[in-house]
Every structure is written in structure tokens, then in C-alpha cells.
Swiss-Prot record:
Biased composition (Basic residues): 10-20
Organism: Oenococcus oeni (strain ATCC BAA-331 / PSU-1)
Protein's UniProt keywords contain Ribosomal protein: yes
The protein's name in its UniProt record: Large ribosomal subunit protein uL18
Any matching Pfam family: Ribosomal_L18p
Classification of source organism: Bacteria, Bacillati, Bacillota, Bacilli, Lactobacillales
Region (Disordered): 1-24
Annotated function: This is one of the proteins that bind and probably mediate the attachment of the 5S RNA into the large ribosomal subunit, where it forms part of the central protuberance.
Amino acid sequence: MITKPDKNKTRQKRHARVRGKISGTAQRPRLSVFRSNSNIYAQVIDDVAGVTLASASTLEKENQGGTKSEQASKVGQSVAKLAIAKKITEVVFDRSGYLYHGRVRSLADGAREAGLKF
């Protein structure tokens, strides 16, 4: 019997492999992305202290409306504004095992437009 590989399990394996290599610090925290079917979430995380410094998602009113890619761009811009307000200008981008395409790329582009460097 032929079985299809579970896409989410392979993504989680990729994410675990990458997380062993990258880590966020107070000077350069990690911008982590989580994508569900209907929403997208972004967090700026200091892994040394284990603290989330800023977060945004499509659950917030100002990030709703438009296509999913447009919403992702809005989330990227709002998380970047929150991070810059806390004097964070550089981050490490953690795509959480997702392909750098579609909503993940839109979020990254939105964050770059708002002034975050990675």
C-alpha cells in the first residue's frame, strides 16, 4: 500500500533541523512565522531569555481584509512596527519549515518594507 508523506510532519522535521542552527538573542531576535489554513502569525522572540518581544497575527482587526497574501503583508508590517518601537532593527527570519513563497514571502516583504533588516 502506497502512503503519502504527511506534509506537516515533514515541515516539522525541517523546522526542528533549522531551529538547531538558528537562535534569537536580545540584540538580534528571531522572527518566527506560523501559518494555518486561515490565519498567519508572527512573533519576535529572544530565545536566550525565552521571551516574546512582539507579535502580530491576522486575528487582529487592523490586519484583516483583502487576500491572504495581503493580510500576511499587513502582519509583517505591524510586527515590524512593534519591534522597531522596542528598538529592534535586525532579526533572524525563521520560516518554520515553510517554503519561502506565497504568504510567508509576503510577510517577510511587509516586515522589510516597515524597516526590519534580515
